[in-house]
Each structure stands twice: as C-alpha cells, then as structure tokens.
Amino acid sequence: MDDIETRVRKLVAARFGVEECDIRLDSDFRNDFGAESLEVVELVMALEAEFGVEIADDDAERIETVRQAIDYLEEAVPT
C-alpha cells in the first residue's frame, strides 16, 4: 500500500490537474493550483474517503498545503 504522502500527492494531482512531480510539500492549494474554496472542500472530502477518516470543519479550514494535509492524516489515520 502506498504511504500517506504518495496517496495525498495522487489525489491532489487528480483534483487539480497537475503532475505529481510539480507538487511540493509547501504547495498551497489556492495560490499554487488556483483552487477555489469549493475545490478545496472537495479535496478534503476525497481525503476523507481515501483514508476513512472524518476531518472536522475547523481542521479542514486549516489545511491549505500538501504538507498540512499529510501532517493531519499522519495523526488521524490509524496505523
């Protein structure tokens, strides 16, 4: 099974139409990929489905970069 970072990168690439090689850990969903608020919400929903977790609205609002998504999931996903 792919690790969390690899899975997040694949989801981000698919959601925002970018190449995985162009995704940096500090890539900002809005500023670097031009994502609108709804697109970020859809990404959060995809992350929830992919990893089988529920991301609280307050937490979701703080996930703005690839690294923040990975860090959150590393804490939330049971090992």
Curated annotation (Swiss-Prot):
Keywords: Cytoplasm, Fatty acid biosynthesis, Fatty acid metabolism, Lipid biosynthesis, Lipid metabolism, Phosphopantetheine, Phosphoprotein
Gene Ontology BP, a term: lipid A biosynthetic process
Any Pfam family hit: PP-binding
Segments forming domain Carrier: 2-77
Post-translational modification: 4'-phosphopantetheine is transferred from CoA to a specific serine of apo-ACP by AcpS. This modification is essential for activity because fatty acids are bound in thioester linkage to the sulfhydryl of the prosthetic group.
Sequence positions bearing O-(pantetheine 4'-phosphoryl)serine: 37
Entry GO MF terms: acyl binding; acyl carrier activity; phosphopantetheine binding
UniProt keyword annotation of Lipid biosynthesis present: yes
InterPro entries: ACP (IPR003231), ACP-like_sf (IPR036736), PKS_PP-bd (IPR020806), PP-bd_ACP (IPR009081), Ppantetheine_attach_site (IPR006162)
Pathway: Lipid metabolism; fatty acid biosynthesis
Subcellular localization(s) per the UniProt record: Cytoplasm
Family, similarity comment: Belongs to the acyl carrier protein (ACP) family.
Stated role: Carrier of the growing fatty acid chain in fatty acid biosynthesis.
PANTHER family: ACYL CARRIER PROTEIN, CARRIER DOMAIN-CONTAINING PROTEIN
Protein name in the entry: Acyl carrier protein 2
Native organism: Pseudomonas aeruginosa (strain ATCC 15692 / DSM 22644 / CIP 104116 / JCM 14847 / LMG 12228 / 1C / PRS 101 / PAO1)
Annotated gene: acpP2
